[in-house]
Amino acid sequence: MSIYDEPKIDCHCHVFDPARFPYGEDSVYRPAGQEIGTAAQFTRVLDAYGVRHALLVGPNSGYEQDNRCMLDAIANGRGRFKGIAVVRNDIDDDALRALKAAGIVGVAFNATFHGVDYYRDAASLLDRLAALDLCVSLQVQHEQLAALAPMFERAGVRVLIDHCGRPTPSAGPDQPGFRALLGLAATGRVFVKLSGYVKFAEAPFPYDDARPYVEALLDAFTPDRCMWASDWPFLRAPERIDYGPLLNLIERFVPDPVERRRVLFETPCRVLGFPC
């Protein structure tokens, strides 16, 4: 069986449809050209590569806290999509419940966009997310997680770490941010998305300098707490990226087919509630 025939769930991707859902006027970055990817276009990509489901992540670029494009994709996706919403730290519980009823399974924390200080007062939100059985999808880079890890260690919420925690490969595995990430494995509530290599690798495709970090994460978290993701449609990518080569890459990074099935399918089914 090839990687294209194995059951798969893509756990980090975005949809952009500015013709139907215009970007905010004050958006810092407005995806354009090949960065635009509608739900219909993404569905064709998933069909072509045998991907059963996908977790859509609300982007700060273009839409920020406007989740309508993603919610429309979920509503019309016939059960194929779930979502991670972008919200204010002071969102009320009724609004969170409404998002959950619409197919949202968690909330995005993007310290690479907002900075660490933006989330220093988010402990109350974490508690409320845990009470509603919603998760956090956390994007950090470099040493940011070292500052935020204590808050997540105390909270009872499930956390999905985006893009391997975006370490700096040349800094080595003992860098504070990556060391903090490995330490979070002990909580049993933290999961890692093996994705977004182009966002942190210093080498070009096939990102050989990312592989030691992927292997360290698989060792610390095990395949039962790791997931795969494409990061389609590849915003701000410094080079052309295609879906197929990324699937080939995870086959190379996780060569054991039993472990790979857990990463590609069984773990996201269990954690995100997709049907298996």
Show where each model-derived region lies.
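Mid-to-C-terminal alpha-helical segments outside catalytic/metal-binding sites
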Residues: 2-9, 32-53, 216, 221-227, ...
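Active-site neighborhood of phospho(di)ester-bond hydrolases with catalytic His/Asp-centered motifs
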Residues: 8-11, 56-57, 85, 108, ...
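Conserved, mostly hydrophobic/aromatic
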Residues: 12, 46, 70, 99, ...
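Glycine-rich phosphate-binding "P-loop"
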Residues: 26-35, 54-57, 104-117, 236
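Alpha-helical scaffold segments that flank or form the walls of functional sites
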Residues: 26-77
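Active-site gating/metal-coordination segments in enzymes
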Residues: 61-144, 150-153, 193, 197
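Catalytic pocket-lining loop regions of alpha/beta-barrel enzymes
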Residues: 105, 119-227
